[in-house]
Amino acid sequence: MNEQPQNSQMIRGARCVLGPQETTHALVHIAGGRITRILSSLDGSSGLQSDWEQIDLNGFLLLPGLVNAHDHLEFALFPRLGSPPYRNYIEWGDDIHNRFPETIAKHRAVPRDLRLWWGGIRNLLAGVTTVGHHNPLWPELQRDDFPVRVVREYGWGHSLALGGDLHQARAATPDGRPFIVHACEGVDELARAELWGLEQLGLMDQSAVLVHGLAIDREGIALMRDRRASLIVCPSSNNFLFGRLPDLSLLSGVEQLALGNDSPLTAEGDLLDEIRFAMRYCGVSALSAYQMVTAVPASILRLSDAEGSIRESGFADVIAVRDNGGSPAERLQSMSMADVEFVMIGGRVQLVSEALMERVPFSQTQGLEPLLIDGTTRWLRAPVSALLEKTEEILGKGKARLGNRRVLIPAAAETEHAV
């Protein structure tokens, strides 16, 4: 997604997040898809012009859009599959193809472009504005109207065992950009040895971004720190597959540690669910959790337009939730998809709750379509009615699940309840 040139806008009334523990009541001026000024509410009236479109977010906390470091967008509609525990990811992959071939085939029958859109919508609903997609950068992901930003400059390989020629993949990675690979995803010797296999191939350097790292030990952490490699963890996925949580007191020894939500094939839910899971079961502090979905993944993914923050000259990528008076980091402890009531990406409104529709100018909400998910209605800048109709032609009426949550078009939901 690219920022879109448009008239000047002003977000007013919200408590604006400047950092994990820092906020100010401010007027946020946006033009050309970027934040041009952040004015204190105390003296901001002098900078307010009558021709600016105003969005009233009084009573809300304005946060930076979240950065999801790791997802497989094409699997958003898949159910959680497996009969754990497993020893490693290869064992899991072999098992689900033997146990659930019909389920896998049915979901793969949904055209990939449709599934990618649902992956974007799943992230949008959770307040994610930028996502790292671990698979090819298919053309659909590069459309200007795709629901969220997808990182475009990166290299990737699946894993040491399943990634093919990793040397070639690394050589094809743009200079200075991340090379992302699953590693040490399991609890056995095969998983533990992968880090050293990557080292022997000469792939461990400051561009290396490992995903999972469950089997990494202290010696491995020392190697990663020496090579300045980064790590992305997906705790709920590890817990489901292997019955083991990542030791974040150990893994936090790497230079940069971010959080990703992985795919619904193995994960607990969306990125907000993953944040709460990590805080509850892995002992991640509110401050660390905030950094793991904002500044740190932005750094790991080499983002350069203030993604993960609210800053003058940066992209106007912001989300809004009801303000409970706590710090931004503390707010994450209870945040779920149902709390995200407003999302703007590049100055363009992408999501609005029903309660906020009347506060946002019509010019900003025109073209949004309603989606009912788990009893919550959100208006989205996506052709959700057509997407759902085409998806249900294959999966069956009422059978579509987005991140294991049921999705409906609100009118269809009303008809269903009336029967």
Regions found by a protein language model. Give the residues of each.
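Active-site microenvironment of metallo-dependent hydrolases
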Residues: 1-31, 36-49, 90-91, 97, ...
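Short active-site segment of divalent metal-dependent hydrolases/proteases
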Residues: 68, 73-75, 185, 265, ...
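Structural motif of enzymes handling amino- and sulfur-group chemistry
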Residues: 271-278, 294
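Active-site core of metal-dependent hydrolases
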Residues: 133-134, 138-266, 282-284, 418-419
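Short, charged, surface-exposed loops that flank catalytic or proteolytic processing sites
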Residues: 283-291
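Divalent metal-coordination and catalytic microenvironments
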Residues: 14, 28, 33, 59, ...
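Metal-associated gating/positioning segment near the N- to mid-region
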Residues: 52, 57-120
